[in-house]
Amino acid sequence: MQIIDPQEVKSIQLAILADIDACCKAEGIRYSLAYGTLIGAVRHQGYIPWDDDIDLIMPRPDYDRFLRAFRSEENEVLDLSHSNVCVETFTKVCRKGTVMIDRALGRALWGVNVDIFPIDGAPEEGLEQHYEAMCRKQEWIPRLCPFYKAVGKNRFRWFVKYCLKRLRYPSLRRCAGVKQEINAELRACRFGDTPLAGAYFGDDGIREFMPAEWFLEYTELPFEGKMYPVIARYDDYLRRLFGDYMQLPPEAQRVSRHDYDSYLTDNA
């Protein structure tokens, strides 16, 4: 395999983003740059200099339509809510013929990708209890995921223990089954029917939930030389999540949060 340098990884991500954007424009699907990608668009008109990924959000109805509509010769949709070997529940659009190797786990993950998070409805009354109930269900996922705690030589031992547990307890739910239960409950709290909305399993906990109307209107901002959709209330959204996001973090914190290497596979 041939390693891909960080700048080329970004070029691939931007090509994936352009592919997603073309599909969404053709199908009338709403989406927005999100999280650090949105900060980058506002503050740098592109990537945050030390960032190395692209995050998007979509209202759940648009997210479901996108999963059905997206077709590409170069890229493929990976809906992680159907996976039994990872804890994530969102979607990645991955470049075919590439692979990312997690340095800590020492194993392949998926191809160079763009992340897409669904935005679901949330009740105003009892929000914290509702959110905590979803989190308790999510806590089951790593327990059922055979490689989640497996690092280095422990991977084989962990996998054997997992298989023996499955044989001894055949009724044990699989990781993807729990994810599907969670998604069914989230879809029941329909986007557009509730006063609040947010990404249940984003990184920012209860701060992820904000007025649903913030996800209804869109504008555009430049990102690496092209215009892309962003929610019109992007300033309110970013201040809710990050506070004064226009202030640069201390220099020691200006580092990537990810620990992987990307490669072209032999069949690329």
Predicted regions located by residue number:
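A short secondary-structure junction signal
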Residues: G126-Y131
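Hydrophobic, well-structured mid-protein blocks that either form specific transmembrane helices
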Residues: E132-K137
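Amphipathic alpha-helical segments
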Residues: P61-D62, F66-E73
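Conserved catalytic core of two-metal-ion nucleotidyltransferases
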Residues: M1-K25, F70-E124, P142-K153, R157-G243, ...
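Active-site nucleotide-donor binding segment shared across nucleotidyl transfer reactions
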Residues: D21-I54, M58, Y63, E213, ...
